[in-house]
C-alpha cells in the first residue's frame, strides 16, 4: 500500500494508464504529431482524424452530436466561454443571470466580472442539504433573465442537482441553461437528448484524463450562440481559437470512452467503499455529514468533526491525501464558502474534511483510513479544552471569551 493514501479524487484524478499509453502515440516523430489544421499533408490529416475520433468519443459520453463539442483548456475555460459567451451575445435580450452561492469559483468569479460590466446576477442560497430548491430558482427568474448556471455535482459536498427539472423550467421560460459538469461528466450518466441543458462544461483531469484539456457542449437544436472569448485562427467553428493539442484531445476522448464503458461497475465499487468509510467513522461522537445523504455522488464524503481544528486534523491525517474545501481555495484559511452557505458556523466549517474516492482506491486503503481517522480524532480531542468543556456539559455558545 502506497502512502499517503490518495483520497482527493475530486481535486484531480491520476491519468488512467490506458489513456497515457494512447496519448504517447501522438507526440513524437514516431507517432502522429502533426497539426490537425494542416490540410496539405498526411501528418495533418492523421492528426485531424484522431481529433475527430476523440470528438465523437466525448459526444457519445453525453449522447450529443460531435458538432456540439468544442475543445477548451479545461472546465474553467469552458465556464468562462459559456457564461461570458452567452452574456455578450444575448445582452440585447436581457442582462440578468442566475447562479448559486455554492458554485465553483470559475463560475462565481466569471459572474462577478459580468457584474462589473453592467450585468445583474442573482446568487441563490441552497437549502441546508446543499441543494437549490426549485421554487427559489423559479422565483428568481425575470423577463430579462438570459442564463441560469447551476452545477451538476458540487465539488466540495458532492450533492447532485436535479438537472432534468432545472432544464424543463429554463426551457419553459426561454432561458439558456448552463451546467458545470466538471465533477459529474464521466461519473454520472448525462443524456442531452433527454435533459434540456444547453451548455455543459467538461474537465479531462476529473475523469482520469490529462490536465489542461476540457470541452464545452454547445447545443445545436435549439441553437445556442456564443461570442468567442479567445481570438485567433478561428478553430473550433470560431468559438475557440488555438492550435488543437492532439495528444491531450486523444487523452480526453479515450478517458471519455473508458468512463462510458465502465461507469456502472466503477460507481458500484466506489459507492461500496464510500459506505464502508462512512460506516467506519460515523460512530465517532459529534461527527456530521455535510450535504444531502441520498442525492449525492457515490465517491464523495464531506464530514465535520466537531471540536477539532481542521488544520490540525489535516496535519494528523498526514497518511491520507485529503482536503478541507476544494483544492482551488483550500490554500486560504477562510472557512469553506460552500459550507457556510449551508448554514454551518465557522468552527464546524473549519473542522470539515472532504474525502473523495475513485477508480484506483482499494479496500485496504479504506481500512487504513478508518483506523487513522479514528485514532487522530481521539488524540486531538484529548488535547482540546473545548472538547473537555463540551463533555462537562458547558454550552460553548454561552461562554464569554476574554479579549486580549
UniProtKB/Swiss-Prot annotation:
Its cofactor is pyridoxal 5'-phosphate. Pyridoxal 5'-phosphate binds at residues 75-76, 155, 183, 203-205, 243. GO terms for cellular component: L-cysteine desulfurase complex. The modification N6-(pyridoxal phosphate)lysine is found at residue 206. Its EC number is 2.8.1.7. GO terms for molecular function: 2 iron, 2 sulfur cluster binding; cysteine desulfurase activity; metal ion binding; pyridoxal phosphate binding. [2Fe-2S] cluster binds at residue 328. The active site is at residue 328. Homodimer. Forms a heterotetramer with IscU, interacts with other sulfur acceptors. Belongs to the class-V pyridoxal-phosphate-dependent aminotransferase family. NifS/IscS subfamily. This is Cysteine desulfurase IscS. It comes from Shewanella sp. (strain W3-18-1).
Amino acid at each position: 500500500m502506497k502512502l499517503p493514501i490518495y483520497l482527493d479524487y475530486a481535486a484531480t484524478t491520476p491519468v488512467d494508464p490506458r489513456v497515457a499509453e494512447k496519448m504517447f502515440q501522438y507526440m513524437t516523430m514516431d507517432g502522429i504529431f502533426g497539426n490537425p489544421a494542416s490540410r496539405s499533408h498526411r501528418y495533418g490529416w492523421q492528426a485531424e482524424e484522431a481529433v475527430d475520433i476523440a470528438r465523437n468519443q466525448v459526444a457519445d459520453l453525453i449522447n450529443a452530436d460531435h458538432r456540439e463539442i468544442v475543445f477548451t483548456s479545461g472546465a474553467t475555460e469552458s465556464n468562462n466561454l459559456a457564461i461570458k459567451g452567452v452574456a455578450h451575445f444575448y445582452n440585447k435580450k436581457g442582462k440578468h443571470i442566475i447562479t448559486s452561492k455554492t458554485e465553483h469559483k470559475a463560475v462565481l468569479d466569471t459572474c462577478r466580472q459580468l457584474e462589473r460590466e453592467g450585468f445583474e446576477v442573482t446568487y441563490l442560497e441552497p437549502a441546508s442539504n446543499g441543494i437549490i430548491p426549485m421554487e427559489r430558482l423559479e422565483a428568481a427568474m425575470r423577463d430579462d433573465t438570459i442564463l441560469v448556471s447551476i452545477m451538476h455535482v458540487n465539488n466540495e459536498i458532492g450533492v447532485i442537482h436535479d438537472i432534468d427539472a432545472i432544464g424543463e423550467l429554463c426551457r419553459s421560460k426561454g432561458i439558456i441553461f448552463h451546467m458545470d459538469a466538471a465533477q459529474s461528466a464521466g461519473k454520472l450518466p448525462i443524456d442531452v437528448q433527454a435533459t434540456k441543458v444547453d451548455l455543459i462544461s467538461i474537465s479531462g483531469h476529473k475523469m482520469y484524463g490529462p490536465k489542461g484539456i476540457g470541452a464545452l457542449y454547445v447545443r445545436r437544436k435549439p441553437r445556442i450562440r456564443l461570442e468567442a472569448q479567445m481570438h485567433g485562427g478561428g478553430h473550433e467553428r470560431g468559438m475557440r481559437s488555438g492550435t488543437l493539442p492532439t495528444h491531450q484531445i486523444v487523452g480526453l476522448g479515450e478517458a471519455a470512452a473508458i468512463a462510458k464503458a465502465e461507469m456502472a461497475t466503477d460507481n458500484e465499487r466506489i459507492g461500496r467503499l464510500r459506505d464502508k468509510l462512512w460506516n467506519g467513522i460515523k460512530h465517532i461522537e459529534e461527527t456530521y455529514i455535510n450535504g444531502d445523504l441520498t442525492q449525492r455522488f457515490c465517491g464523495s464524503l464531506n464530514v465535520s468533526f466537531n471540536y477539532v481544528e481542521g488544520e490540525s486534523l489535516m496535519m494528523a491525517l498526514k497518511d491520507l491525501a485529503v482536503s478541507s474545501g476544494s483544492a482551488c481555495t483550500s490554500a486560504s484559511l477562510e472557512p469553506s464558502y460552500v459550507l457556510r452557505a449551508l448554514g454551518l458556523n465557522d468552527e464546524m466549517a473549519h473542522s470539515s474534511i472532504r474525502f473523495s474516492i475513485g477508480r484506483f482506491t482499494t479496500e485496504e486503503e479504506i481500512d487504513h483510513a478508518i483506523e487513522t481517522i479514528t485514532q487522530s480524532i481521539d488524540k486531538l480531542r484529548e488535547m482540546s479544552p473545548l472538547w473537555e468543556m463540551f463533555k462537562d456539559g458547558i454550552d460553548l455558545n454561552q461562554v464569554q471569551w476574554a479579549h486580549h
